[in-house]
Amino acid sequence: AASDVYKRQELTVRGTTFRHPKGVLHLTQFTQVALAVVAYAQTERLRAENTLAPTSYFAGHSLGEYTALASLANIFDLEGVIDIVYSRGSAMGSLVPRDEKGNSEYAMAALRPNMAGIDADNVDAWVAEVAETTGEFLEIVNYNIRGQQYSVAGTKKGLKALVDKANAIAPRAAVMVPGIDVPFHSRVLREGVPAFAEKLDELLPQELDLDALVGRYIPNLVARPFELTQDFVDAVAPLAPSGKLDGLRVEDLSEHALARLLLIELLSWQFASPVRWIETQELLFGKVEQIIEVGLASSPTLTNLAERSLAVAGIPEGTIRVLNVERDQEQVMLADVSEAPAPDPVAEPVAEEAPQADEAPAEAAP
């Protein structure tokens, strides 16, 4: 039965045994592949319906960055997406120690600072104080809604202290996120960056579609449009401390070689660095009229984040249209657009005397 497969706690594939107390399908490398394939298929449908704007901005939240690059910048084909996402998930999972039953010491919590009276500018300091007081690892890994929603990875002990402290101020100011036992996007995973960078180097084509990347792609790591400029290289370098960008001058490499190096650095350090979605959204809000989320209608996460963030920013409702590709497919596919009615018959136009030279039409007036 399907439920038996879903709950299966141990699976051996090609000599490797996978274990998870809630079922192996909860393991990162399997859940992320499933999500990536769905997103890839949804984007390909948009392409088939000719609804992808060739100059639109694109960004992906965490895992979504890979499918966005694959579908909108032609970086990977479907097989490549599956390979890289599986490798990414495996790298994350392998860096987390587990007991004989497959349990890890890590978890994740959602923090709502506004409910606990924590100012948006003080959220990082507040979390750091809890970590210092308890001696436990805690790190904000998803910056989702300014002042209202942040994901915090950490040890179970550290997160319990954080949740207890926040909820002592206001009930449900912090809640544990079920089903997560890997500290995604945290410094705990930095040990796996070099191996993942090698995998990216293996799978990335030597020449990239630069028109699809430059000025359009907004990486999680820096939350600003991708560029082949010295300023962009200098902005990425301290966030991707492999040393590969240190002292690099853009004129030393061809555009394709530079783009490829930057992409490897951006993506390999992405899984061990926070997702800067607040800044990404605020950038988009100042540049676009419509946002389309590629994702499931049953869980329109980014649609909800965008709508709430627009309200926080004080942007009037309706100024920017926010759609989910599955939930709002008629609007996304333009299927809700009615044909224009046939024009009423009109009389033949009557020629009028042209204006004299000293009677220029208003459009030509200075």
Regions found by a protein language model. Give the residues of each.
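Short, intrinsically disordered, charge-balanced linker/junction segments flanking boundaries
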Residues: 1-2, 6, 363-365
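Acyltransferase/transacylase module recognition
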Residues: 3-55, 187, 198-349
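Long, low-complexity, intrinsically disordered segments
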Residues: 352-366
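Alpha/beta catalytic cores of group-transfer enzymes, especially the acyltransferase/condensing modules
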Residues: 71-245, 255
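Gly/Ala-rich beta-loop-alpha elbow adjacent to hydrolase catalytic centers
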Residues: 60, 64
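Gly/Ser/Thr-rich loops at beta-strand to alpha-helix junctions
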Residues: 65, 156-157, 182-185, 296-302
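Short alpha-helical patches at coil-to-helix transitions and adjacent helical residues
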Residues: 32-40, 65, 104, 108
